[in-house]
């Protein structure tokens, strides 16, 4: 199963959000069985981060473990000392359509 996630960064906080992904989140995703497929910025909105995850197992269980991980809690707290770095997060679960082409 795939998950398309869209984050809107707080004004001026996109560098902090990307740093948290590079320094902490990517390794934590791997630890909890979530595979990063790709990361994008919309061409017309640099304050938005869109990314695609692949889940090997139940996404709900994986997210519960991720959100309870002490390393995640520490990274989140450290990155938000000066306030939240995201204004909103949207998540959609996607399934491939069997009889249509895919590169995934």
Listing of model-derived features with the role each one plays in the protein:
Residues 1-16, 28, 98-103:
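Surface-exposed interaction/gating patches
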Residues 16-20, 63-64, 77-78:
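A short acidic/glycine-rich loop-to-helix N-cap element
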Residues 13-37, 71:
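Short amphipathic alpha-helical segments
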Residues 2-8, 37-70, 90-94:
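Short, well-ordered beta-strand segments in beta-rich or mixed alpha/beta enzyme
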Residues 25-31, 59, 72-77, 88-89:
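Short, surface-exposed linear patches
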Residues 22, 67-71, 80-83:
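Generic secondary-structure transition motif, activating predominantly at the C-termini of alpha-helices
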Residues 35-48, 75-104:
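Glycine-rich beta-strand-turn "strand-cap" elements at beta-sheet edges
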């Amino acid at each position: 199963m795939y998950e398309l996630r869209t984050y809107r960064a707080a004004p001026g906080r996109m560098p902090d959000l990307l740093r948290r992904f590079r320094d902490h989140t990517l390794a934590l995703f791997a630890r909890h069985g979530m595979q990063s497929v790709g990361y994008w910025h919309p061409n017309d909105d640099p304050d938005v981060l869109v990314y695609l995850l692949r889940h090997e197992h139940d996404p709900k269980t994986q997210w519960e473990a991720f959100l309870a991980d002490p390393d995640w809690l520490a990274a989140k707290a450290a990155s938000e000392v000066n306030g939240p770095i995201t204004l909103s997060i949207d998540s959609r679960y996607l399934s491939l359509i069997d009889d249509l082409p895919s590169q995934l």
